[in-house]
Amino acid sequence: MAKIVECIPNFSEGQNQAVIDGLVATAKSIPGVTLLDYSSDASHNRSVFTLVGDDQSIQEAAFQLVKYASENIDMTKHHGEHPRMGATDVCPFVPIKDITTQECVEISKQVAERINRELGIPIFLYEDSATRPERQNLAKVRKGQFEGMPEKLLEEDWAPDYGDRKIHPTAGVTAVGARMPLVAFNVNLDTDNIDIAHKIAKIIRGSGGGYKYCKAIGVMLEDRHIAQVSMNMVNFEKCSLYRTFETIKFEARRYGVNVIGSEVIGLAPAKALIDVAEYYLQVEDFDYHKQILENHLLG
């Protein structure tokens, strides 16, 4: 059986359609790899791609995409609501079928080494590939963002895992690693007060005493004049989407603010969304494996 790996590179470009189209063309040009989905957000100025392929082809696709991004995205001119530190901000590998997390860790290291060797971009290994505990958390790795990275790389504890203590002048720094599937889930508020989104995000994220498997920040969607709580649900089975959604609604009420919508960025495991439906429909004795038609059709 072929080993199947998912790769979800995040690029610091969500406004220039020509560059986005170039990334799409690059992804589609690699044999053995399928581009399942991509989405771009102008306010975040960020694009998220989802690819799957065998364990060899996915490495080539990841490298070629990072290469294209490094040649076409200038971080010195980048402005957006989402935290970022590089043209390719983060490049995770996720085990999908007949492959282990440890094998994906090795894939991430091989890709990271090649990116640094051929493109001169410093690399931090993160999540399951992290070389020390504090580097497991992407937020800690990315703290300081592109503008603060030149100083950060000179700090005693923040030498890159690959490369010198000097950022790429236009492509910045990239985080590469292996991780389990996550859900990128954002909730929109009917307010233009970013402080409210910041306060709610602080309450629900694990680092603030909230949900252990939720990472959250407040961002402003300038084009819509609304604030947003932007989340990564790193383990949706232990911290469900409905739980964070309901908590955000509850906390927003103290400020006289309502939730006006939500969005899932990129692809999400079916079970993450089925759990939400099961909760709101109050389905009794539901069996995900037995009662979902597609599970039987797909074997």
UniProtKB/Swiss-Prot annotation:
Q: Where is the signal peptide?
A: none
Q: Which UniProt keywords apply?
A: Cytoplasm, Folate-binding, Histidine metabolism, Ligase, Transferase
**What is this protein's record name?**
Glutamate formimidoyltransferase
Gene3D superfamilies from the UniProt entry: Formiminotransferase, C-terminal subdomain, Formiminotransferase, N-terminal subdomain
Enzyme nomenclature, EC number = 2.1.2.5, 6.3.3.2
Q: In which pathway does it act?
A: Amino-acid degradation; L-histidine degradation into L-glutamate; L-glutamate from N-formimidoyl-L-glutamate (transferase route): step 1/1; One-carbon metabolism; tetrahydrofolate interconversion
Q: Which family does it belong to?
A: Belongs to the formiminotransferase family.
Q: Name one GO cellular component term.
A: cytoplasm
Enumerate the Gene Ontology biological process terms: L-histidine catabolic process to glutamate and formamide; L-histidine catabolic process to glutamate and formate; tetrahydrofolate interconversion
Where is it located? Answer: Cytoplasm
